[in-house]
């Protein structure tokens, strides 16, 4: 049989047998296409968690919370599979909605949307929600903002206060926002105004409240995390604003005189394609040209529906890291020199 450098690693067909999710993922490392990429993402994420003094960022876009991914993200926060979350405001609004005891509902993408509108039901592809309940949450956020009073703060600071308030109201720790508050995991929302949280804050503004979310402070704070971390890894669920907000930290640090060399690990689950030129499908190889990803970084991009990938990946990681005593970063925001980071089990 002819062998050369290209034919030293044969594929191994998947056997059907009793095994764990992590064992299935290990087996898929010897298959092909996006199945192998999914397995490689688990391998890379697991290695990233074992890497000493690494700060793991997650960018969360798409309607992941309405689609049922909320407890997966909060589990990853509690178990410190991620150390900093950058999210769309919509995901966090929907998280607050459920934290307050309300629901999203199994629906159909074939439903009559005019009838849904008449009944006050909103549709997110095949998920339904009650518009009146959303508006109640909008006004609750407005009321909460008025309780805070007239301040200027970053979205991280605002989400911390919101998590504290939801916890005070008895929200369970399966909430993303509450878990982040209790476990000192910062949440940044770079497009907070583009969400129902922004609607709530607009209601408060119309009532006369002067509360400003300082988005430039957001940029500064998250860049400080990158600058003061020994190494960094990124995980993107979808792309969009959260992806670029994290990616640009390396460029900003370089412009400010701290050329860190790019993120050391990079994983993405996306259904977008690179040939359209948009960031959501942009490859990590392209990001190397910008200095956002280190040339030697472990890079895995999986072209997949994230609602398929996340449950599989989360269960595999849970099995692999169950006994791992990870050294996770602890953030101290009020020091004399700004942010300080310590690494503790």
Swiss-Prot record:
Q: What InterPro entries does this protein's entry cite?
A: Deoxyhypus_synthase_arc (IPR022899), Deoxyhypusine_synthase (IPR002773), Deoxyhypusine_synthase_sf (IPR036982), DHS-like_NAD/FAD-binding_dom (IPR029035)
Pathway given for this chain reads: Protein modification; eIF5A hypusination
Q: Name one GO cellular component term.
A: cytoplasm
Write down the superkingdom of origin. Archaea
- Any one GO molecular-function label of the UniProt entry: deoxyhypusine synthase activity
Q: Which residues form the active site?
A: 292 (nucleophile)
- Which cofactors does the annotated protein need, by name? NAD(+)
* Reactions catalysed according to its record: [eIF5A protein]-L-lysine + spermidine = [eIF5A protein]-deoxyhypusine + propane-1,3-diamine
The keyword Protein biosynthesis appears for this protein = no
Q: What is its EC number?
A: 2.5.1.46
Keyword terms, alphabetized: Hypusine biosynthesis, NAD, Transferase
A biological-process GO annotation? spermidine metabolic process
**Which family is annotated?**
Belongs to the deoxyhypusine synthase family.
Entries under PANTHER family matching the protein: DEOXYHYPUSINE SYNTHASE, DEOXYHYPUSINE SYNTHASE-LIKE PROTEIN
Question: HAMAP family under this entry?
Answer: DHS
General function of this protein: Catalyzes the NAD-dependent oxidative cleavage of spermidine and the subsequent transfer of the butylamine moiety of spermidine to the epsilon-amino group of a specific lysine residue of the eIF-5A precursor protein to form the intermediate deoxyhypusine residue.
Q: What is this protein called?
A: Probable deoxyhypusine synthase 2
Give the originating organism: Methanosarcina acetivorans (strain ATCC 35395 / DSM 2834 / JCM 12185 / C2A)
């Amino acid at each position: 049989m002819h062998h050369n450098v290209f034919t030293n690693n044969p594929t191994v067909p998947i056997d059907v047998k009793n095994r764990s999710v992590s064992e299935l993922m290990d087996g898929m490392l010897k298959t092909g296409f996006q199945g192998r990429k999914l397995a490689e993402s688990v391998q890379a994420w697991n290695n990233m968690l074992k890497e000493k003094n690494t700060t793991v960022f997650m960018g969360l876009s798409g309607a992941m919370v309405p689609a049922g991914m909320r407890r997966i993200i909060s589990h990853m926060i509690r178990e410190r599979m991620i150390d900093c979350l950058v999210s769309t405001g919509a995901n966090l609004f929907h998280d607050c909605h459920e934290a307050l005891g309300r629901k999203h509902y199994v629906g159909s993408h074939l439903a009559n949307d005019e009838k849904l509108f008449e009944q006050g039901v909103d549709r997110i592809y095949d998920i339904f929600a009650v518009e009146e309940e959303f508006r109640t949450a909008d006004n609750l956020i407005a009321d909460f903002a008025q309780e805070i009073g007239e301040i200027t703060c970053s979205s991280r600071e605002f989400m911390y206060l919101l998590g504290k308030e939801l916890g005070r109201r008895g929200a369970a720790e399966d909430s993303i926002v509450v878990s982040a508050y209790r476990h000192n995991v910062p949440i940044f929302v770079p497009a907070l105004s583009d969400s129902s949280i922004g609607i709530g804050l607009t209601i408060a503004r119309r009532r006369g409240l002067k509360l400003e979310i300082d988005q430039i402070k957001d940029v500064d704070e998250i860049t400080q995390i990158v600058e003061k971390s020994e190494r960094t890894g990124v995980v993107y669920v979808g792309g969009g604003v959260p992806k670029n907000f994290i990616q640009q930290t390396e460029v900003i640090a370089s412009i400010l005189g701290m050329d860190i060399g790019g993120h050391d690990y990079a994983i993405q689950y996306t259904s977008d394609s690179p040939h359209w030129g948009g960031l959501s499908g942009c490859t990590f190889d392209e990001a190397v040209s910008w200095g956002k990803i280190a040339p030697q970084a472990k890079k895995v991009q999986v072209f997949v529906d994230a609602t398929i990938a996340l449950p599989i990946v989360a269960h595999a990681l849970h099995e692999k890291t169950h006994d791992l005593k990870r050294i996770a970063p602890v953030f101290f925001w009020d020091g004399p020199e700004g942010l300080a980071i310590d690494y503790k089990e």
